[in-house]
Amino acid sequence: MKDYNVQRWAFWALAAAFVVDFLGYAFIVPILPSWKAQFALSNTEATALVSFWAVPLFIFGPKTGRITDRFGAGKTILASLFLLTISALLYLVATMDLPIDGFYVLALARLIHGASGAAILTAGFAAASQIWPTRFGEMSGKLIAMATIGGLLGPVIGGISYEIDPNLSFILLAILTAGVIPLIYVTTNDLGKGDEPVQGGVPISVFINNPVLFRIGLLVMMTTLATGALEAGVPLFLGEELGLNSGWIGAIILVMVLAQGAGGWLWGTLVDKNGPVRYMIIGWSLVTISLISAGIVAWKITDSVTAAYYIIVILGVFQFAIAAAQVPMLPMVDTATSQAYGKGGAGLAFGAFGTAWAAGTIIGPLIIGPVYDYTNSWAVALGILAVPMAIGLLITLRNKEMLSDCYTSEMANRVSE
């Protein structure tokens, strides 16, 4: 019973950290058009603010992994929550009258948020892989679902509170983030005390030289490329092209994040039961079709209400399906690292995973914004995202036996232990 209670509290502590992490990430989505007008930003600059969140994750992903392995997931997450709180208050500072351009303060806030968010992701997944070694697919799927809840609440809370009082909104974000600190504090030891990795640290070159991990990294990057691009571009498309108000925009974003949350919960459980590859193939196929469909809707349908209904369905399918492509890769990177290099470097493994995740999150918004600025066509900007999705499908199909063998053999070893 004690172990069950420890695991239960550990899950809810990790879940709360993931919620506030992604709540802050998505908090600015409905505010982005206001910032664009306030700071006279181009579409490229506005979408770049979304990308900035992922820059520290890309650069410092492996470093946060080493920190996690050395000091423990609990302490790493605890320190990161303090930084998240500071970054929330920096958003408030950016909107004040300053001697410098507020855009640079916004960028700094996003970078700090990204650095602390990177550590939470790395430490959280590393802790989950150690606490639930044979149920990691299920638990990582649930954690992604909880992160999605944060992504759901972020635009809603951010949009409503910003409309009431712009200053109040960022104070509220800081309070919500700081509120998780006590829960992480009391579960710090349960999440992992930390120690030197058994192998002395998995060299980062492994994630390039190992064929399984390299392919997983490419696939991770492609999934987050699409989601990052849509998170940045969809609010601008709905507002500028279709003329929808904040209520419609919020409703469509609501469907997107609910669909991904449901998908993350479902696919993670199915992966533990049946293996990952079949669900990855389903996911890649559906996301490719949905993005082509989104481009066609943006091109053909001019009535804003009709287009909005189509977009709700299409992007709901996309978000549900992207979870099928994305969630299985979490247990796969865990098992592939353990199989090739032994145990002891879970933090570094997920830090490198985070680097691939961040690469796509950075590239995505920097594709959709400039493509639209250059072509002045949302049909092209949305439809072009189907290309990397189709490539992801081809990579999965060509390497399905390698990916499946890696996963099934390692999980068999864990069950026998």
Where are these regions (language model features)?
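Central cavity-lining transmembrane alpha-helices of secondary-active solute carriers
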Residues: 51-65, 254-266
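C-terminal ends and interior cores of transmembrane alpha-helices
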Residues: 82-99, 286-304
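Helix-loop-helix hairpin linking two adjacent transmembrane segments in secondary transporters
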Residues: 143-188
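Short amphipathic helix-loop junctions that connect adjacent transmembrane helices
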Residues: 30-44, 232-247, 335-338
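Cytoplasmic membrane-interface "Motif A"-like loop-to-helix N-cap segments
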Residues: 70-81, 273-287
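Cytoplasmic helix-loop-helix junction between adjacent transmembrane helices
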Residues: 109-147
